[in-house]
């Protein structure tokens, strides 16, 4: 395998799964993956330069840092995380966003599948929860939120099957893990008899569970978009940065328990997982919120973190330090590789560039223009759209002609958005620089035009554009700007050489085969790796 990991590591005190088999070529017995969502490589560089004794500086200085790493396009949480665990981009995995459309599946609740018309929203958000207003997603725990660690490690039990799309072949609901087209590192690691765990923000992250629906033995998914207990009514855990930090801290506690050899709830001693970790959400909210805790959010100038983001970077650093300290305490530092990255970045990092555009009137106008040109057409042209700082649109007419019509219309629209100070700011071309339509959109994602999940329209926005109907956020992700894509990638610990910087371009999809290689497993067992020839990272 290209990029073979350097050196084997002598086993230290270890709570591995009984009977588990590690290859003698394995550099590590455990891989701890940390995704700091929203974090840019530039943020990491900025923080480490000013805090040379920090935990983040320890990772960078003591490991291999890839300074030109990019996440997936679209730069959304779901394709970003799926890419890190499969080695595949959206065109291969079929996962383009957390809220998309399928032309092949049937609407939720369909019982007569022979006559039902295909076409359904694929919603991988809190909307699938049995109770999206509760941090336990409807499990019914008492004493929340402090009792949240008692939440099940099998979150697909908390998904409401009546909300799921229906398979036209079997006429049965499809869970998120049924929608993923390829296998995951969890699948390969389980097949090797090793333990798996992960922690994320929605029950729908059971998409990572693989075709078996159970490849992650301990999946802890407190609902981030539930009502934030102890905060103003109507707020979820993302609308106050202190709440987001509190929420992230529950997941840190889960990972600390796993380092200690327990499951996330600390109720069963099962051994430290071979693959485990979590995502941090608090950097992302510190970038998106105009203000929180009396501090200004986002950036004060291009790439310069403002006071809220600085505070949050320090929070993440403290939590990373706690995880590293626990690994050392359990004598696992020498047998564990820590990987730091992010599902996505955030744009813009220049507050002066911000232009918030309401996409609602643009989509309404497109539907009206299509109706005027095609008066006998039934329904709206736009079947589904998701617009953050990019534009993804699925059309009810999947023809190239309809896609071309939509592209022409969007590129002809002008109007006014709002800048960082809430003043009017003009826009042209619907805030877009380029639009891929129909076959061109499929080509952009390296898939066939017949892919039932690929958007008919993929619009790349002008720098600084955020599609939102209000002024409640100052940044977003999902697009294809450097601010969306340029995330950190640091590999530290077992098998990684200290103080190494790699400046060549790499993709975060390479994390998946690298995890397997570190554990002494065959990265070619990943279907997406075989399809895309995803390289293993050269940890020198």
Label for each model-derived stretch:
Residues 28-41, 58-60, 84, 189, ...:
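Beta-strand elements within well-structured catalytic alpha/beta cores of enzymes
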Residues 44-94, 195-197:
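Short, structured active-site-proximal loop/turn typified by the sulfatase FGly-forming signature C/S-X-P-X-R
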Residues 16-64:
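Active-site-proximal N-terminal segment of extracellular/periplasmic enzymes that hydrolyze or transfer
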Residues 1-15:
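Secretory targeting and sorting signals
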Residues 202-203, 207-225, 263-316, 352-354:
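Active-site His/acidic residue clusters
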Residues 26, 245, 249-256, 260-267, ...:
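A long, amphipathic alpha-helix that forms part
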């Amino acid at each position: 395998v290209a990029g073979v990991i350097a050196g084997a590591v002598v086993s230290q005190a270890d709570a591995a799964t009984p009977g588990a088999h590690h290859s003698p070529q394995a550099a590590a017995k455990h891989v701890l993956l940390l995704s700091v969502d929203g974090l840019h490589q530039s943020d990491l560089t900025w923080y480490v330069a000013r805090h040379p004794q920090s935990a983040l500086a320890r990772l960078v200085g003591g490991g291999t840092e890839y300074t030109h790493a990019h996440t997936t396009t679209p730069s959304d949480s779901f394709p970003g995380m799926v890419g890190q665990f499969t080695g595949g981009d959206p065109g291969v995995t079929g996962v383009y966003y957390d809220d998309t459309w399928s032309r092949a599946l049937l609407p939720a609740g369909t019982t007569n599948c022979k006559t039902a018309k295909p076409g359904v929203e694929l919603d991988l958000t809190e909307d699938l929860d049995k109770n999206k207003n509760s941090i336990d997603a409807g499990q019914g725990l008492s004493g929340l939120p402090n009792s949240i660690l008692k939440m099940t490690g099998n979150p697909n039990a908390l998904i409401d099957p009546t909300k799921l799309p229906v398979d036209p072949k079997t006429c049965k609901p499809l869970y998120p893990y049924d929608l993923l087209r390829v296998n995951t590192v969890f699948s390969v690691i389980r097949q090797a008899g090793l333990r798996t765990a992960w922690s994320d923000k929605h029950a729908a992250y059971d998409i990572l569970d693989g075709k078996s629906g159970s490849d992650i033995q301990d999946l802890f998914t407190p609902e981030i978009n539930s009502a934030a207990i102890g905060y103003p009514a109507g707020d979820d855990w993302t609308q106050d940065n202190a709440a987001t930090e509190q929420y992230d801290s529950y997941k840190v506690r889960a990972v600390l328990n796993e380092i200690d050899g327990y499951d996330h709830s600390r109720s069963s001693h099962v051994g430290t997982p071979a693959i485990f970790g979590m995502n941090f959400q608090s950097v992302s909210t510190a970038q998106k919120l105009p203000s929180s805790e009396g501090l200004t959010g986002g950036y004060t100038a291009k790439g310069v973190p403002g006071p809220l983001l600085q505070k949050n970077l320090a929070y993440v650093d403290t939590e990373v330090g706690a995880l590293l300290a626990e690994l050392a305490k359990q004598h696992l530092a020498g047998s564990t590789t820590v990987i730091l990255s992010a599902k996505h970045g955030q744009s813009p990092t220049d507050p002066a560039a911000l232009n918030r555009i309401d996409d609602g009137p643009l989509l309404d106008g497109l539907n009206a223009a299509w109706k005027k040109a095609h008066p006998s057409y039934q329904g709206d042209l736009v079947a589904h759209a998701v617009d953050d700082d990019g534009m993804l649109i699925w059309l009810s007419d999947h023809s190239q002609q309809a896609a071309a019509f939509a592209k022409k219309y969007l590129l002809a629209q002008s109007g006014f958005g709002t800048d960082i100070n809430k003043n009017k700011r003009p826009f042209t071309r619907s805030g877009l620089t380029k639009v891929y339509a129909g076959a061109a959109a499929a080509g952009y994602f390296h898939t066939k035009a017949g892919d039932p999940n690929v958007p008919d329209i993929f619009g790349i926005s002008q720098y600084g554009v955020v599609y939102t109907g209000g002024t409640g956020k100052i940044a977003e992700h999902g697009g294809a700007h450097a601010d969306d894509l340029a995330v950190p990638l640091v590999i530290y610990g077992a098998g990684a050489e200290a103080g190494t910087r790699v400046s060549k371009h790499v993709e975060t999809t390479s994390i998946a085969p690298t995890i397997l290689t570190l554990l002494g497993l065959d990265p070619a067992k990943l279907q997406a790796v075989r399809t895309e020839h995803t390289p293993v990272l050269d940890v020198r």
